[in-house]
């Protein structure tokens, strides 16, 4: 699963940075890879799914993009780490991204591309082993 995420990270980030949209084709590819991964590796704990669902619904109510939610959902379902800790990583990197864009353009952006923050947070979270 991590190889598929690594292979699609750059195209997803480029698409999200250019148009603020993650094309569904990338999420479909990741969905089929995740389905295959889960068929072989099995399902993780169901409490993890419940926590992930609560986080995703909260993000939906905060008007986060659907492509970002699909990507986060696939990552949270296929990895057996703490969803709350991972989302804290995503929040930190999204805030840094927001501050950098604000400093460069000298205006507060109305929206930001979240995919780079998602992938950087995943990489650092997996690398540090929290």
Give a label for each model feature.
Residues 1-130:
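A membrane-topology feature that recognizes alpha-helical transmembrane segments
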């Amino acid at each position: 699963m991590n190889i598929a995420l690594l292979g699609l990270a750059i195209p997803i980030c480029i698409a999200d940075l250019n148009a603020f949209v993650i094309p569904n084709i990338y999420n479909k590819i990741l969905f089929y890879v995740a389905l295959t991964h889960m068929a072989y590796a099995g399902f993780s704990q169901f409490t993890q799914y419940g926590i992930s669902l609560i986080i995703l619904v909260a993000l939906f109510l905060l008007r986060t993009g659907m492509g970002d939610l699909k990507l986060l959902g696939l990552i949270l379902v296929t990895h057996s780490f703490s969803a709350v800790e991972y989302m804290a990583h995503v929040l930190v990197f999204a805030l840094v991204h927001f501050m950098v864009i604000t400093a460069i353009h000298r205006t507060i952006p109305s929206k930001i591309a979240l995919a780079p923050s998602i992938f950087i947070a995943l990489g650092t979270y997996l690398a540090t082993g929290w």
